[in-house]
Amino acid sequence: MSYTLTTWNDFKNYQSTCYRNYLYASEGLRCMGSTWSVLAPLKGLGEDVYILGGEPHAASTAGTFPEEAREDISAAEIAGLGFHSCSYLKLFVGEVVRDKIAITDGTIKEGYPKPDLIWTTHLCNLHSKWYQEVSRRLGGIPMYPIDMIGGGDAEKDPKIVKYVCDQMEEGIRWLERVTGREFSDESFIKAARNEIKVLVLWGNICALNMHAPAPLDERRLIALFPPAMVDRTTDEAVQLYEALLKEVQHMVETGQSVVPDQRFRIVYFGLAHTYGHPEIARILRDAGAEIVASVYTFGTAGNFRGFVNGNWSWEPIDPAWVDELDLSSRRDALSALAKIVLGWPTWQGVRSYWALEQMARAMVTEFNADGLLLAPTRTCETDFRNGYIAMQRIFRNEIPTVEYDTETVDVRKMDIPGSKRKTELFVHLMEAHKKGGA
């Protein structure tokens, strides 16, 4: 019997409330940017800071309003953005062009809510350009991008950590200058500890999928990690993920799962695409094949032990470690934040293929995978596209491995019939491998 998460509605409500606060704020500060950024510095400006993050907003809009998403993408292309550029970027800019915005509770608001500032990171070539274009179209919104140097073990390199910390420290002075507000180190440090705690808690939740049956499937994982992206700096966010961890631990102890029929365990590398293409997810579900581990859902807003003595580990970090962190000064908090975000799995593989291989080997082993599904996104520069070719060679003689191009939100760029055929082939390969015939 399938287990129903009791915390499900709390997660949906938190995400929708954050978006509604941004849309309808009559006072306070609206802040926009990549939620792949360190968010805690924004909370040093006060509790009335409302955040709209590009990636989770674009993804949730595509899932909630697929027709609106297509109109947004078309509007952005008509306005001059390239056909092959990031689909999330075009959806986001398309809302600005159309002067309307849609959020997860079903609201479509006419009149785009103009942000007071843009606080973001620059990881791929489009990250800062995304918000530079939004700033330009909205009349020149003040913008501060932080240049991130990803790559294997970057969080252990003091030069890289200092480089990121220095930018954030200058960014705090910039925030004071453009808002006219005094920065509170006390509020910032509290938000920093919450931010780190949520990332560690999500890593703990994901690691529980090492058990059989895995308590969570990809559909739930996709739906449960966005609140950590939307705003992970609040006490409420910490409480949400603490409650979820406790519930999933109970599921493991009692052998329960949201999908108890798990004949095949799949490790997935790529951006989450099955939420937009249920016909592909259905092929896997009907065969009892479940994605139990995904670098995207695990590593976009979660932290793990990472590299230990040169080898990657998906084992979780003890949440008590966060409580013991010395965050007594602004610089201490900035350093801890820089290390935690540089340690995100999704950033490791963006700049380092040896890290990508290490993560894949560890995930296949630690999550006891029956198959490896590789689905690079055509328009995402930070997806691990080039590394997938090597991964096919590495794993093809070990476990069934299938690769096909996909797309996050723009169905025009996805070969649905071809992807369905490859997914069916993938199921047959796993069946044959389990019987000893492949």
Predicted regions and their residues:
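A charged, amphipathic alpha-helical module
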Residues: M1-L29, C165, E169, R173-N303, ...
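Redox- and metal-dependent alpha/beta enzyme cores, enriched for Fe-S-associated oxidoreductases
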Residues: E27, W36, P41-A76, A272-S352, ...
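An N-terminal, globular interaction/scaffold subdomain
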Residues: C31-L117, H122-Y131, S135
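A short, acidic, amphipathic alpha-helical segment used as a generic capping/interface helix at domain edges
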Residues: I103-T107, Q348-N368, R385-N386
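Internal, well-ordered alpha/beta segment that forms a basic, Gly-enriched binding/recognition surface
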Residues: G111-L208
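Proline-aspartate-enriched helix->loop->beta-strand connector
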Residues: P115, V364, N368-L374
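Short acidic, glycine/proline-enriched helix-loop-strand junctions
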Residues: V134, L138-P142, D383-D410
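C-terminal regions of proteins
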Residues: M391, F395, V402-A438
